[in-house]
A protein has these predicted regions:
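Surface-exposed, low-hydrophobicity beta-strand/loop segments enriched in small/polar/acidic residues
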Residues: 1-179
Length: 179
């Protein structure tokens, strides 16, 4: 698997997120020790949001409540905006929305999964009308992977468009089909 290329850190645009209206937000639960400066928590990551754990963790086999990290980016300076600058490490308190069917996100936080390189991935994006692609959680990694295999169980989404995030970097838009 290969991480989608970014200029710095991942970003997230919430196109439709029911958790904002429904109050299904985790914001007073710290990140686990899994998140370090070398492997930080970024916007758009899927995490284990079960508060019974007393901390936000990377997904594992059997995760029952997936959340998506959507911590608000800050302005980092007069000409440097926070969209691709933001990350969190262990002990920080990110905002995490509980995924629900019908949510729609645009993000560059994903793994190219089934595709060997960016060229193969972009070719697959051109065929979305005829060959659907899906995003699925990966145990031990917050970046969901893109796959051509439709999941038969668990949380997953379907890629609907290859586009950009507001700072102009390439991204995918996907809708959650099962949460």
């Amino acid at each position: 698997m290969a991480k989608f290329p970014l200029s710095k850190y991942a970003s997230l645009e919430m196109n439709r997120a029911a958790y904002l209206k429904n109050g299904l937000v985790r914001s007073q639960t710290p990140l686990s020790d899994e998140f370090t400066a070398a492997a930080p928590c970024e916007n758009g990551m899927w995490v284990d949001a079960n508060i019974a754990n007393q901390e936000i963790k990377l997904p594992a086999e059997g995760t029952v409540q997936y959340g998506i990290v959507y911590t608000t980016e800050k302005e980092w300076g007069r000409y440097v905006y926070g969209l691709k600058e933001h990350f969190d490490v262990a002990g920080a308190y990110p905002r995490v929305g509980i995924l629900q069917s019908g949510d729609i996100f645009t993000t560059n936080c994903f793994d190219m999964g089934d595709f060997a390189n960016l060229k193969a991935f972009e070719e697959a994006m051109k065929a979305l009308d005829t060959t659907p692609l899906y995003v699925v959680p990966v145990a031990g990694d917050g970046r969901p992977k893109v796959t051509a295999t439709k999941p038969t169980s668990g949380a997953y989404g379907q890629v609907v468009k290859y586009t950009t995030v507001p700072n102009g970097e390439k991204a995918i838009k996907y809708t959650i089909l099962e949460a």
